[in-house]
């Protein structure tokens, strides 16, 4: 018996508070990258983000941001991550894709305004 994998057309939305928090965090960490865990809910391919978590033991630099995910508590409200790209495009690098966490990865490029937030799936396709 072969199971058919259901394919969702993913959609991402976030509250104004979450958006403002992401942009402020990226601006505060510039010229280094910043990274946050996205908290929210997902249903039928739609991801709704309503909170942010600073990951424990995160490390950032001019061209990297990451955290070990093994010390994270089990929290089903974690739906993905967001990090900044202070220089260059908002497209995910191979390293970004290999460290994908959750359902969505958001990348914010400088100068960190509303139109500078992009969402990606685990295959590197824009959502």
Segments (PLM) and residue ranges:
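Conserved, mostly hydrophobic/aromatic
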Residues: 81
